[in-house]
């Protein structure tokens, strides 16, 4: 009995020793995994800078885009051409003629009106449709010309071409933006400031002479208006009488 008890007691530490070795192995694995995670978390990442432009480098025969990083100490390439941003671009680049760039200056808001710039004002071709004429008249005028001078140039060109109907140079004319515009342009307005190259010209309507002359056509216009009203009433009465006769004839035939 004592031997069996002693064997059991001796065998128990062996079993406990086996279990403790297993727990030590699992603990060692846990510690190693934890150390690996801490090492991966402590890895330093390189900082990336976002730059507006990409520099193209050639490595052998292949072309690829490469962005220089200041952290690596690579030298930055100097730009050969300066970058011009949109706010620095002047509005004169949208002018119709390159010679307009010389006319603009920061001290003058409307250089076309100045006397010093009128001699150097550029010329443009405008097309003017004349009332009653089949096609427009093309004339070359300066941007500094006003409406009155433009009308004279167009009338002279119209008469030289021999168009019909013939125009009297002494008569007054009006210049409009288009055929559908009611209000005419003022004679002092500058062609360069209007922003249009096509116009419509027609004869100016005659003005009434005086107060007495204006009253007489008003009275004469009342007379035909009263006659028209009476004629309309007579036509209505005649239609009613005709229809009543037709209805009467139909009733007689039915009976």
Swiss-Prot record:
Coiled coil: none
Annotated region described as Disordered, given as residue ranges: 1-78
A UniProt-annotated Pfam family: DUF7054
Entry superkingdom: Eukaryota
Sequence ranges of Basic residues compositional bias: 1-10
Bias kind Basic and acidic residues: ranges: 44-61
Signal peptide positions (record): none
Protein name per Swiss-Prot or TrEMBL: Uncharacterized protein At4g22758
Species assigned in the record: Arabidopsis thaliana
Taxonomic lineage from the root: Eukaryota, Viridiplantae, Streptophyta, Embryophyta, Tracheophyta
């Amino acid at each position: 009995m004592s031997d069996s008890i002693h064997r059991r007691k001796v065998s128990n530490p062996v079993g406990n020793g086996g279990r403790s070795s297993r727990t030590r192995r699992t603990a060692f694995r846990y510690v190693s995994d934890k150390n690996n995670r801490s090492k991966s978390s402590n890895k330093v990442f390189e900082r990336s800078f976002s730059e507006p432009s990409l520099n193209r480098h050639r490595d052998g025969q292949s072309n690829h885009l490469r962005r220089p990083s200041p952290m690596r100490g690579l030298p930055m390439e100097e730009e050969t051409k300066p970058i011009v941003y949109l706010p620095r671009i002047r509005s004169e680049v949208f002018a119709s003629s390159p010679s307009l760039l010389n006319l603009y200056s920061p001290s003058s808001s409307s250089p076309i009106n100045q006397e010093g710039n009128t001699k150097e004002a550029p010329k443009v071709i405008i097309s003017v449709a004349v009332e009653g004429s089949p096609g427009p008249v093309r004339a070359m005028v300066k941007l500094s010309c006003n409406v009155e001078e433009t009308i004279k140039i167009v009338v002279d060109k119209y008469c030289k071409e021999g168009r019909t109907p013939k125009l009297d140079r002494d008569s007054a004319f009006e210049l409009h933006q288009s055929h559908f515009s009611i209000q005419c342009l003022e004679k002092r307005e500058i062609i360069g400031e209007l922003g249009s190259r096509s116009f419509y010209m027609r004869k100016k309507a005659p003005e009434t002479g005086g107060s007495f002359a204006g009253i007489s056509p008003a009275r004469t216009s009342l007379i035909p208006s009263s006659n028209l009203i009476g004629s309309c009433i007579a036509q209505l009465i005649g239609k009613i009488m005709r229809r009543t006769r037709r209805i009467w004839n139909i009733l007689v035939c039915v009976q």
